[in-house]
Amino acid sequence: MTKKQLHLVIVTGMSGAGKTVAIQSFEDLGCFTIDNMPPALLPKFLQLVEIKEDNPKLALVVDMRSRSFFSEIQAVLDELENQDGLDFKILFLDAADKELVARYKETRRSHPLAADGRILDGIKLERELLAPLKNMSQNVVDTTELTPRELRKTLAEQFSDQEQAQSFRIEVMSFGFKYGIPIDADLVFDVRFLPNPYYLPELRNQTGVDEPVYDYVMNHPESEDFYQHLLALIEPILPSYQKEGKSVLTIAMGCTGGQHRSVAFAKRLVQDLSKNWSVNEGHRDKDRRKETVNRS
């Protein structure tokens, strides 16, 4: 049996340079992440990792918050070099001293190495101690001029493989306004102005995924006209959402009860967007009325 390859990114660098944003970015890229991993525990942790998927990916922040960081990190890295089945890279985040001082002042935090309270002294000492590690790093990112969003984009470009680069996902869902707008929706569209199958006895207990209801909703001229305008609005903006580093875009279609019109529209939208994007389909309230009837 072929041993599975373990991919590891060790995130380190200057305090205040953006390691928290970085580890969140790796999580969005599908990595298992841990913040503030003590260096001495790293080799043992990697041995204990239960590999359940092919090509598992890890991203761990290892920095000077661990008191033994400077004394242990070199020996740990040497050990990792000799570990079979491990592909690891070091990501070092840096920023100009002036910018780091400004960030510390903004958060009103003290630098962990500033014994006398002077932030700049702590930064200079940390930079000196981290110089060997920076020289060993395969990826050095200067975050001085980067916003958190720009840093996420930079890391995605550097560390995404082809599959991850396409990890932008669209969630299309239907819902009923009577039960509230989904709190995680990015785009919300209201189709309550369309003819309602609820008032037809033969369609009332069916849903928009059923062909008779779907055809009833979508075959109305106003439905087709609105849908084409909707598609023309949504399709051009999807690349911009992806470019901005958004990992999931949730599009919610709403009608009164979330059983007929919104379900049909969500189904149609999924069919079209799936031609070029990764799309998931969901119907929050589709069966809610049925569940209510069964309980009564």
Curated annotation (Swiss-Prot):
Record: residues binding GTP: D63, M64, R65, S66
Residue numbers binding ATP: G13, M14, S15, G16, A17, G18, K19, T20
UniProt GO molecular function: ATP binding; GTP binding
Keyword line: ATP-binding, GTP-binding, Nucleotide-binding
Gene3D superfamilies: P-loop containing nucleotide triphosphate hydrolases (3.40.50.300)
Top-level taxon of origin: Bacteria
InterPro entries membership: P-loop_NTPase, RapZ-like, RapZ-like_N, RapZ_C
Pfam families: PapZ_C, RapZ-like_N
Family affiliation: Belongs to the RapZ-like family.
PANTHER family to which the protein is assigned, alphabetical: RNASE ADAPTER PROTEIN RAPZ
NCBIfam families registered for this protein in UniProt: PRK05416.1
Cited HAMAP family: RapZ_like
Its biological purpose: Displays ATPase and GTPase activities.
Name of the featured protein: Nucleotide-binding protein SPJ_1472
Top-level taxonomy: Bacteria, Bacillati, Bacillota, Bacilli, Lactobacillales
